[in-house]
Amino acid sequence: MKLLEERIRKDGEVLDGDVLKINSFLNHQVDPELMMQVGEEFKRLFENEKITKVLTCEASGIAPGIMAAYQLGVPMVFARKKKPSTLNDAVYWADVFSYTKKVNNKICVEKKFLSSDDHLLIIDDFLAHGEAVKGMLNIAKQANAAVAGVGVVVAKEFQGGSDWVKEHGYRLEALARISNFENNQVHFVGEK
């Protein structure tokens, strides 16, 4: 998605050699117009898949997830990182390690929101090592839900998560595919 790549070049910041900070339009402040276009692109890519729900993870997956769900005309469910007191004990759990925050999280989804009747589209902001996506796939498996594919706003292709998703037989669509960072500059797959 050319518009997204341009925005990453303009406003993105490479930190510590392998972290991309895009807080000005996705991970802290959200650009709703850009997210609407992200949702439209996910719809274009997955509209023939008979999606029944979008599954994402709080917090930064919510903006692209809700826009994709809106465009597809289906509900969005987000995995919570902490079980609130209002959630009953009937939940699916998965362990997720955050490389950015260097912490282990348990994510959960209430069982009544996912079932074997569902055909899920998993959406997330980033795919690096793939831990969040692996956790959501684990939850989908516990629910016996089918997974139509995985859509990510940004894939850091050099960190292994993209390969893992594809090697495990899942369709992967990334709107911006980063091949590497060099001299604090972002390089996209396919660039010369």
From Swiss-Prot:
One of its GO terms (cellular component) is cytoplasm. Homodimer. 5-phospho-alpha-D-ribose 1-diphosphate binds at A128, H129, G130, E131, A132. Keywords: Cytoplasm, Glycosyltransferase, Purine salvage, Transferase. Belongs to the purine/pyrimidine phosphoribosyltransferase family. Xpt subfamily. It catalyses: XMP + diphosphate = xanthine + 5-phospho-alpha-D-ribose 1-diphosphate. InterPro entries: PRibTrfase_dom, PRTase-like, Pur/Pyrimidine_PRTase, Xanthine_PRibTrfase. Its EC number is 2.4.2.22. It comes from the Bacteria. This is Xanthine phosphoribosyltransferase. The lineage of its organism: Bacteria, Bacillati, Bacillota, Bacilli, Lactobacillales. Converts the preformed base xanthine, a product of nucleic acid breakdown, to xanthosine 5'-monophosphate (XMP), so it can be reused for RNA or DNA synthesis. It comes from Lactobacillus gasseri (strain ATCC 33323 / DSM 20243 / BCRC 14619 / CIP 102991 / JCM 1131 / KCTC 3163 / NCIMB 11718 / NCTC 13722 / AM63). NCBIfam families: PRK09219.1, XPRTase.
